[in-house]
Amino acid sequence: MATKEEHVRKPDWLKIKLNTNENYIGLKKLMRENRLHTVCEEAKCPNIHECWAVRRTATFMILGSVCTRACRFCAVKTGLPTELDWQEPERVAESVRIMNLKHVVVTAVARDDLKDGGAAVFAETVRAIRRKNPFTTIEVLPSDMGGVYENLKILMDARPDILNHNIETVRRLTPRVRARATYERSLEFLRRAKELQPDIPTKSSIMVGLGETKEEIIEAMDDLRANHVDILTIGQYLQPTKKHLKVVKYYHPDEFQELKEIALSKGFSHCEAGPLVRSSYHADEQVSEAAKARQLKA
C-alpha cells in the first residue's frame, strides 16, 4: 500500500500513444492564429492526441484562459482574469466552420468577477456558431455561474443542444476537491437548466480515484437522476502536477464497465465510462437522437 509520500503507480492501460500528425499540427496552428483556447491544452487532457490527430475535434474554452477559482484537480491557470473579448464568439464560430465540425463543445473558465458569470458571451458564442454552422450540434459546459440562475437563463435562451455541468466528485469530497463550488448548487444548476428548457438534454461527469467509495458513486448517480440528468460520463482522475491532489486509486477497466451498467440501470440515456473518459471525450457520439432531430428542424 502506498504511503502519503508515494505515488500510486500508473497502470499500463493508462499509457497513451502520442500522435502529432498533420491534423494535430493544423488544429494547433488554427487555435493560435485565432487567439483561441482549448480545454484540451489548458487542462492537460490525456486524449488531446486522439481528438486532434485522429477525430479532428476540440473543446473550445472561452472567456480567457485564467480561472477565478482554484479547484485542486484542475490544471487550468488561476488568478486575475483577462478582459472580455466580444470578438471571441465569431472566431470560435469561424473555426468550427473551417474544421467542419458536426458537434462542438464549448466550455469556459469560471468568471466570478463578472456579474453575469460570462453568460452573455457564452450565449453569443452559441448563436454565432449556429449562424455559421446551422447543422452543427452544440454542447455547452459552463461553471455554476455562482448559482445565479438568471445567468443560466441567458445561456439556456440561446438553445444549446446539450447543457453539461459537472459535479466532478461525490458529495463528501466536494469541499476538498472544489472548495468554491458546492455539490448541492451543482445539482440545483442542472435541475434549473432542465426546468428552463425541458427538451434540452442535460449531462454531468464524475472523476473517480480521489478516495470515494462505490456506494458514494452510486449515491451521486441517484442524485443526478433525481435532478433529471440524462447523460453521465465517468473517468479516472489523473494528477496534472505535483501541486494537485494525488490519485488514491486507479480503477480497472472492468470496474468502469460495472459502473456504466449501474448508471444505465438507473435510467441515464447514455453513459460513457472508462479510464481516459473525460466530459467531452467522444461527445459527438453522446448527442441524443432528439437533439439531432431538433437541430435538423431548425
From Swiss-Prot:
Residues the record lists as binding [4Fe-4S] cluster 2: C67, C71, C74
Enzyme category, top tier: transferase
Residues bound to [4Fe-4S] cluster 1: C40, C45, C51, S280
Disulfides per UniProt: none
InterPro entries per record: Aldolase_TIM (IPR013785), Elp3/MiaA/NifB-like_rSAM (IPR006638), LIAS_N (IPR031691), Lipoyl_synth (IPR003698), rSAM (IPR007197)
Single GO cellular component term: cytoplasm
Gene3D superfamilies cross-referenced by the UniProt entry: Aldolase class I
Superkingdom of the organism of origin: Bacteria
CC cofactor: [4Fe-4S] cluster
A single MF term (Gene Ontology): lipoate synthase activity
EC numbers: 2.8.1.8
Record domain Radical SAM core: where: 53-269
UniProt KW NAD keyword: no
Cofactor note: Binds 2 [4Fe-4S] clusters per subunit. One cluster is coordinated with 3 cysteines and an exchangeable S-adenosyl-L-methionine.
PROSITE patterns: RADICAL_SAM
Subcellular location: Cytoplasm
Pathway where it operates: Protein modification; protein lipoylation via endogenous pathway; protein N(6)-(lipoyl)lysine from octanoyl-[acyl-carrier-protein]
Catalytic activity from the UniProt record: [[Fe-S] cluster scaffold protein carrying a second [4Fe-4S](2+) cluster] + N(6)-octanoyl-L-lysyl-[protein] + 2 oxidized [2Fe-2S]-[ferredoxin] + 2 S-adenosyl-L-methionine + 4 H(+) = [[Fe-S] cluster scaffold protein] + N(6)-[(R)-dihydrolipoyl]-L-lysyl-[protein] + 4 Fe(3+) + 2 hydrogen sulfide + 2 5'-deoxyadenosine + 2 L-methionine + 2 reduced [2Fe-2S]-[ferredoxin]
Keywords: 4Fe-4S, Cytoplasm, Iron, Iron-sulfur, Metal-binding, S-adenosyl-L-methionine, Transferase
Matching NCBIfam families: lipA, PRK05481.1, PRK12928.1
Family membership: Belongs to the radical SAM superfamily. Lipoyl synthase family.
Name of the protein this chain belongs to: Lipoyl synthase
Organism annotation: Geobacillus kaustophilus (strain HTA426)
This protein's encoding gene: lipA
